[in-house]
Amino acid sequence: KGAFKVEYLLKPSLELMEEFLKIGNGHVIHVSMAPELEGAEEVIKYLVYKNILVSGAHTNANIAQTKKGIDWGIRLSNHTGNAQRSIHHREPGALGGYLLDERVDCELICDLYHIHPDMAKLIIKIKSVDRICLISDSIEATGIKPGEYNFLGRMALVDEDGWSKLPDGTIAGSTKDMIYGFRNLVKELNFSMEDAIKMACVNPARLSNVLDSKGTIEVNKDADLVVIDDEFNVMYTFVEGKLEYSKDFNYDYCNPKIIPVRTMKEARGDYIGQC
């Protein structure tokens, strides 16, 4: 379940999913769920019928349950290696199932904290750069100062390095942005810019069925552009050709509703591992 509270988790329900899609009014393009849950088969097959991408997420599925989910229509592994049953030599688990099946693409958090650098390399080597989607897993705490905050429905600590944790030591999402992971792919894992762009831009657009308008710089596509310097600092961001961010704007992008409950110094003794 990751960092989510148990009461926030929902069992797969066709009736509820139909309601979600009605409210979404055509804007729902991706749904994540655990395939081992009762009712998952019906909902997954319904979403596939509706041409909506389904990913296996926050799952304790064994290899057999994972294979069933893929056969029903799961085509993406949600933040691969995190909140998934891991690999054991007698039980490959969800992670093993998603890595082995060629029908499945894999999301990857590349902050090198959620996933060890060598594990990230292994996942990419198994799946290839054409089947990896770089994600941030960023939450509303991204960019805020160290301290204890109330988000995800509970208290969590953001430490001096920007990592977010629950009191029991569980990683609570990420506070790093996409460009941080992109830089790590190039600078720390030694992938080419071209391969990093595939993982960060092209593959996500393909899976989201918007590659005809996004994901690459081409004539007649949306001019969604990020301009960076040699140190991977974001200089400018354009959305459909319109300048939406500039390093010169000097905006405060932090969410003003997120106010620290305690400072880092006051809170850190209550958190396992001292963060």
Listing of model-derived features with the role each one plays in the protein:
Residues R90-L108, L112, I124-S136, A141-V227:
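His/Asp/Glu-enriched, well-ordered alpha-helical/loop segment
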Residues R206, T216-K265, Y271-C275:
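C-terminal cap of metal-dependent C-N hydrolases
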Residues L14-K145, E244:
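Active-site core of metal-dependent hydrolases
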Residues L9:
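His/Asp/Glu-rich metal-coordinating catalytic cores
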Residues K1-K5:
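Metal-cofactor-binding active-site regions of metalloenzymes
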